[in-house]
Amino acid sequence: LFIGSGGIRNTGDVAKAFALGADVVGITGIALHLIQESGVEAVVRYFEELSKQLTNYMLLLGATAPSDLRKVPVIYSCETTNYIANRGYDLVALSSNRR
């Protein structure tokens, strides 16, 4: 089980986590902040909107389930590519080994 968590703030982050192989995605920081500031109803609204937006992302990318996002080609920025390469990892191997 691969859990995508930490720094997940919006639908784009959720989609990226699934595309990189996450089985589930944790979004606790924003939920706790919303509960503290606006109550449980705000959290429910946030997750309802996030779910709608994720469905739109999946529609645009031809995915019928979040796990299908693993099949979508991932394009890394120059900064990310350099970060990975400078740590001795093979980006091609990492990209082809996505679940």
Predicted regions and their residues:
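Short beta-strand/loop segments at the ligand-binding rim of alpha/beta enzyme cores
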Residues: 1-5
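Alpha/beta catalytic cores of nucleotide-metabolism and tRNA/nucleoside-modifying enzymes
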Residues: 9-99
